[in-house]
Amino acid sequence: MDTTPLTPLTKGITLYQHILSQQALNPDATGEFSGLMVQISLAAKLISRQLAQAGLVENVLGFTGETNVQGEAVRHLDQYANETFIRVFQNTNLVCLLVSEELEDPLPLSNQCPIGSYALVIDPVDGSSNIDVNVSVASIFSVQRRNPRATDETSSLLQKGTGQVAAGYVLYGPNTMFVYTSSQGVHGFTLDAGLGEFVLSHPNIRIPERGDYYSINDAYSAEWQPGTRAFIDYLKQAKSRGEKAYSARYIGSLAADVHRTLLTGGIFLYPGTVAKPKGKLRLLYEAQPLALIAEQAGGKASTGTERILDIEPKTLHQRVPLVIGSPYEVDLAVAFARGEKQTVVAGS
């Protein structure tokens, strides 16, 4: 029998064991954060089980007929996932407030909210339009401590991304994978359906310094700002400069595209356009958590002109452009966006 002591990065340990091992390293830990992470993983298991029945049972595919705060048609899966997160945290006193893509205002989840208590910020199902065609989707989350100096619930959550306690996503694909950081590296856990547990499969994920792939929706190229267009043209002409050619990859599911970029290197872009320079992705529950993961893995995340984690949100559902991935490609994209690099010349 192997009696080697478990550490937080022992491959094959469960997410629960990992969290408890991390907690043991902090003498001031109360167990609240550990409990919170376990409940997120429970929500993920429930959503994963529901997704596995898509097409076999009612109210997984298709629309509810309602419209959310974003002005988007609500899908059954969006509604189920949102209600699942609410259900697993309600009356636990682990989370005081829940912010969701599906809710206009913060939702109080506990009557007992001491100063500094946690808030959970989520996109319950990112890329839900893809489930009808059996493409990967994800839940994205961010854990914050409420600002005790704030005068109301909303302003208590409008914090820079550097203040996140933890961030992560659960990718529902060929398998279900829980990826998170609490600013101690990025770790990935794969759901073992037989055990019903997330098991450490990708300890200490590091993004390559430079990659071979770029990911962007080329259908919007006519609407890109000049810096974005010049950057993508530059990548496309790598071979003419005697460099290794880049390949394009685009799933159309944000967390899935970022996950691939995290593992293989390169860059993902969801830029602003001439008509919508402020972009489409939401800062608090899409850009901020993914940016923290990228930076903890050695990558970078920017709007094209500003570091994502330095942005102070003005509203709960604020939108931003997103450029995220390997340091080399992100720095290059930023140089083009700022006009510091403007021309594409063979051999440059």
From Swiss-Prot:
Cofactors named for this entry: Mg(2+)
Residue sites binding substrate per the record: 126-129, 217, 250, 280
Pathway: Carbohydrate biosynthesis; Calvin cycle
PROSITE patterns: FBPASE
Keywords: Calvin cycle, Carbohydrate metabolism, Cytoplasm, Hydrolase, Magnesium, Metal-binding
Subcellular location: Cytoplasm
Gene3D superfamilies: 3.40.190.80, Fructose-1,6-Bisphosphatase, subunit A, domain 1
Annotated Pfam families: FBPase, FBPase_C
InterPro entries in alphabetical order: FBPase_C_dom, FBPase_class-1, FBPase_N, FBPtase, Fructose_bisphosphatase_AS
One Gene Ontology cellular component annotation held by this UniProt entry: cytoplasm
Catalytic activity: beta-D-fructose 1,6-bisphosphate + H2O = beta-D-fructose 6-phosphate + phosphate
E.C. designation(s): 3.1.3.11
Cofactor: record remark: Binds 2 magnesium ions per subunit.
An annotated GO BP: fructose metabolic process
Residues the record lists as binding Mg(2+) 1: 101, 123, 125
Family per record: Belongs to the FBPase class 1 family.
NCBIfam families from the UniProt entry: PRK09293.1-1 (NF006778)
Subunit structure: Homotetramer.
Protein's UniProt name: Fructose-1,6-bisphosphatase class 1
Gene: fbp
